[in-house]
């Protein structure tokens, strides 16, 4: 149960209302995280723009980004993000075996390129101060420095989202939720 109130569609105005309507058109619901951020519409606007920039642009495949988002969320035990990004990873072609192996990438059916990104993501999530040089060097064998920045941005963004959602005890958003609020 949420530890903070969720702004309803009818109470939202301006930028928050625009974000809500966009999410309804895209997903058929208003994510609970958006409904919390709507308490401060300028934060909702910048969060939404950052999310779109990290996940919707660049050259790292969306499938890899979704696996990283899900891996970070699993490591941080964030039910809200796990529920949402399991669905999104599957839509991008991730298999159940891959999803189940995200916290133990050595046993998972990943390409060498994916495994390098996931090793880095796991190390960054567990302790960003102690990412081994060998993990970063392996990443450089498969990705440009610009792509490595993209990968780190996904992990960092979801570390932020995970802590935000965990602190407020947000449960996963249900289909159609928020549309009639």
Predicted regions and their residues:
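Hydrophobic alpha-helical segments
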Residues: 1-181
């Amino acid at each position: 149960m949420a530890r903070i109130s969720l702004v309803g569609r009818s109470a939202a105005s301006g930028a928050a209302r625009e974000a809500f309507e966009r999410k309804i058109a895209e997903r058929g619901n208003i994510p609970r995280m958006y409904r919390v951020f709507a308490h401060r519409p300028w934060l909702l606007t910048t969060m939404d723009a950052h999310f779109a920039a990290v996940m919707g642009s660049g050259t790292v495949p969306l499938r890899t980004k979704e696996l990283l988002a899900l891996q970070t969320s699993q490591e941080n035990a964030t039910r809200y993000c796990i529920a949402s990004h399991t669905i999104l990873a599957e839509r991008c072609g991730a298999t159940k075996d891959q999803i189940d192996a995200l916290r133990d990438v050595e046993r998972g059916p990943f390409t060498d390129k994916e495994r390098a990104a996931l090793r880095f993501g796991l190390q960054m999530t567990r302790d960003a101060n102690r990412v081994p040089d060998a993990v970063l060097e392996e990443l450089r064998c498969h990705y440009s420095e610009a792509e490595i920045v993209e990968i780190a941005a996904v992990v960092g963004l979801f570390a932020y989202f995970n802590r935000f959602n965990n602190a407020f005890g947000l449960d996963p958003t249900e289909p159609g939720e928020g549309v009639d609020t």
